[in-house]
A protein has these predicted regions:
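Pre-Walker A (Motif I) flank of P-loop NTPase domains
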Residues: 54-62, 87-88, 137, 286-287, ...
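Conserved Walker A/P-loop ATP-binding site and its immediately adjacent core
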Residues: 71-120, 144-145, 294-300, 354-361
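Short, low-complexity, polybasic intrinsically disordered segments
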Residues: 231-239, 475-490
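Conserved coupling segment at the C-terminus of the helicase ATP-binding
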Residues: 27, 31, 43-44, 50, ...
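Conserved helicase motor "Helicase C" RecA-like lobe of SF1/SF2 P-loop NTPases
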Residues: 356-375
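Conserved RecA-like P-loop NTPase helicase motor core
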Residues: 384-474
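Conserved pre-motif I regulatory segment
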Residues: 8-63
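Inter-Walker segment of RecA-like/P-loop motor cores
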Residues: 97-101, 106-157, 379-384
């Protein structure tokens, strides 16, 4: 890995005051003789972003392909903001694992950063907190630490935030304003309020029987009549004190303007538009950069974040990654998916798989393949997989936030169309039909692009991608969906 020595980029004046440099000027302070120029895509986005920043455009979404040096670009932007604005800057990662990877990369670049991460499983802890508080270092942290209702960063004078894998922030912020109920008795009490509903009354019985297919949204007119009683039941049960305290703090006075979704063993209440402007990260006039290998739907960003960012992209990729896509339906067997799954369990090579939900994990578990059913177990198993302690690993709904470069893994399995676990997205997905709705098709494509990048992390990397499940095969082979992908994929 190339070394950068940002520590030497200081003026010769007394006190060692830092020189204000553009991100490209910082880039050229290389200590490794083999690296003389940024990649074309890095050059383009850094120039475009710096011009937007100097024009006082506060929100910018920057898209770079997997393996194009997105992390370095983000760190250069963060360092530029810290130096020019003289304040605190956060570089926010999806999870602790990617936070650790970013921390390691920043050190190799010669960038002296602080961090607030949970690296040992014993809770989040500071590294170089004093340098961060003195505005001398960017802080690397994760989304949970920044977006939760008790964030320690809220009282800080933040001048800039870099959101890595920004689409994850969309989901997490939406979740912050969603009140979830899993108490069986409370679910029954609320559901029974609508047992005589002409619109959804017939669904209540299957819902209370925990039918996995049961899913509905309370009609707005009926929610208008029942929301006060729902509020009374929630307060009486004290469910608002058990979990979702932040969401309830906002929702309790705004229930009338919320949507209520009911599914097997769960009820979710959320506004159509999260009150993101009340969140300290989005309420202040600061620099926000949204990094992503895919360009999230700008309408969704506006809905969730309450901002309309400037789109910054490179016109063409630096390379076309070597990916071999194999479609199970093209094999010509009567049951190709079952054949491939069984063959994978017998394969000597390492294999990483992604399925849409926990139920789908059971198929692989019965074949003796390692699976992880929750986020804590997933992080543990990913580390074991990277260190070759296990050869096969399948996770549910983990289309992003995992880097498996080079020899770590060259075989990726995607088994099933991406599926989002929250009731709201599930409801709209089913109501509008995935295959026909442009908005939902864009979401599916974005998740698949993220998945394709798990095992291809650089220009000299390669991957075999096995695509299982009839619906997934048909969706990808439908040429009408090509427009939702970048040219380097289709």
């Amino acid at each position: 890995m190339v070394g950068y020595n940002f520590a030497k980029v200081r003026s010769s004046s007394k006190g060692g005051e830092e020189i204000r440099l553009s991100p490209l000027e910082l880039f050229y302070k290389l200590t490794h003789p083999e690296i003389e120029h940024p990649r074309p895509s890095q050059l383009v986005v850094l120039e475009k972003w710096y011009a937007a920043y100097q024009s006082s455009i506060n929100d910018n979404i920057v898209s770079l392909n997997t393996g194009a040096g997105k992390t370095l670009v983000g760190l250069l932007m963060a360092e530029t903001l810290r130096r020019e604005k003289g304040g605190k800057v956060l570089y926010v990662c999806p999870n602790n694992l990617l936070g650790k990877q970013t921390l390691d990369e920043s050190k190799r670049y010669g960038l002296d950063v602080a961090s607030y991460l949970n690296l040992d499983g014993n809770g989040a802890a500071w590294s170089k907190e004093d340098k961060y508080l003195a505005n001398e270092s960017v802080c690397i942290t994760n989304y949970d630490a920044v977006l939760n209702s008790l964030s320690k960063f809220e009282s800080h004078e933040i001048v800039g935030v870099i959101f890595d894998d920004a689409h994850i922030a969309l989901e997490l912020l939406d979740k912050q304003y969603t009140f979830s109920i899993e108490n069986a008795e409370l679910i029954k009490q609320i559901a029974m309020l609508f047992k005589d509903s002409p619109s959804i009354g017939y669904k209540i019985e299957s819902l209370l029987q925990n039918d996995p297919q049961s899913l509905t949204m309370v009609p707005l007119s009926e929610w208008h009549d029942a929301h006060e009683e729902v509020k009374r039941l929630i307060i009486k049960s004290k469910a608002h004190k058990e979990s979702g305290a932040f969401a309830w703090k906002f929702l309790q006075e705004n229930l009338l303007h919320c949507l209520c979704f009911m599914g097997a063993g769960k009820i979710e209440i959320s506004p159509l538009y999260p009150k993101s402007k009340s969140h300290y990260v989005f309420s202040k006039k600061i620099q926000r950069v949204y990094l992503s290998a895919t360009v999230p739907n700008l309408g969704d960003i506006t809905r969730v974040f309450g901002v309309t960012p400037k789109r910054i992209e490179s016109e063409s990729p630096d390379y076309r990654a070597d990916r071999l896509f194999l479609f199970s339906k093209k094999i010509g067997l009567s049951n190709p998916d079952e054949f491939i799954r069984k063959s994978l369990s017998e394969l000597k090579e390492k294999v990483f798989g992604i399925v849409p939900n926990k139920l789908s994990l059971l198929t692989y578990k019965t074949l003796g393949i390692t699976v992880a059913e929750d986020s804590v177990a997933a992080l543990e198993k990913i580390l074991e997989f990277k260190s070759d302690k296990i050869q096969k690993l399948v996770l549910s709904n983990r289309y992003d936030g995992i880097d498996l470069p080079g020899a770590v893994c060259h075989i990726l399995v995607i088994d099933g169309l991406p599926w989002q676990g929250d009731l709201k997205t599930r409801f709209f997905s089913e109501y509008f039909h995935n295959e026909n709705n442009a908005f939902l098709r864009a979401i599916i494509a974005a998740k698949l692009v993220q998945a394709f990048g798990r095992t291809v992390r650089s220009a000299d990397d390669y991957s075999i991608i096995l695509l299982l499940d009839k619906r997934l095969n048909n969706w990808l082979l439908n040429r009408d969906n090509d427009k939702f992908f970048k040219k380097d994929i289709v």
